[in-house]
Amino acid sequence: ICLYLFKYMVNIIGPFHLAGRSSIKAMWQKSKNSFFITILPVIYNNLSVIVMSIIVSPLQLGFYYGAARIHRALNTLYGPVGQAFYPRLASTDSGNPEKAKQMTKKFLWIMTAAGFLFFSMIYFFTEPIIFLLLGEEFLFASTTLKIFAMVLPLTAISHVLGRQWLMIRRNDNQYAKILLISSIIGVVSIFILIRSYGILAIPISLIIYELLTIILILGFLKRAR
């Protein structure tokens, strides 16, 4: 199937050619901020897991991964929803910026409400969810999952403010800088917290990361008025 689709694509757009140095440089200048916006959260998460796997016991690591799987199942829903909304928002902004602003505000309320719904589901029904999805032996991860639940509404807010509004307003460079600052402080907070709090340090650092991202974005938007 892949070979057929590849051949079909080549028939439509023609054969592939390696880009020249000037073309590569131009593409990099145009897309580098989007690259950093995508890669920085991944680096932050991977560094967090590496640090934790070195310090905590394998048993604690297992509890962490159990709680993280439930958090990630809900957290990954934001991406597809945002991607579906982004083209319409971009199209509206090109012709009517004020309408795009109002649309973003409505989307922010919707995503925030969804975030608090996810938070309420996990926080108030932690043990039944763990028992159903992971098994009784993972009940020791209840506190970890409760803290992960607190991250969900914060992620919803930072997602709309950053990946929707700042990027629509062509503030990719500023957003990349904000994510870099938040990622560095998030990783540093793990080193500070992990000895005392173990696996709880990861969701706590995520709260710090998301809160700092939101505060920095709001500060930038206030200055840019």
Protein language model features and the residues they cover:
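Membrane-interface helix-loop junctions in multi-pass transport and translocation proteins
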Residues: 1, 60, 126, 131, ...
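C-terminal transmembrane helix end/exit motif
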Residues: 1-20, 81-84, 162-165, 173, ...
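Interhelical loop/hinge segments that connect adjacent transmembrane helices in multipass membrane
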Residues: 2-45, 88-102, 225
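Interfacial/gating helices of multi-pass transporter permease domains
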Residues: 26-30, 34, 52-72, 139-143, ...
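Alpha-helical transmembrane segments of polytopic membrane transporters and translocases
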Residues: 33, 48-49, 62-78, 110, ...
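Helix-loop junctions and terminal segments of transmembrane helices
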Residues: 67, 71-95, 162-168
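Interfacial segments at transmembrane-helix termini and the short loops linking adjacent helices
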Residues: 124-153
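Membrane-interface junctions at transmembrane-helix termini in multi-pass inner-membrane proteins
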Residues: 152-178
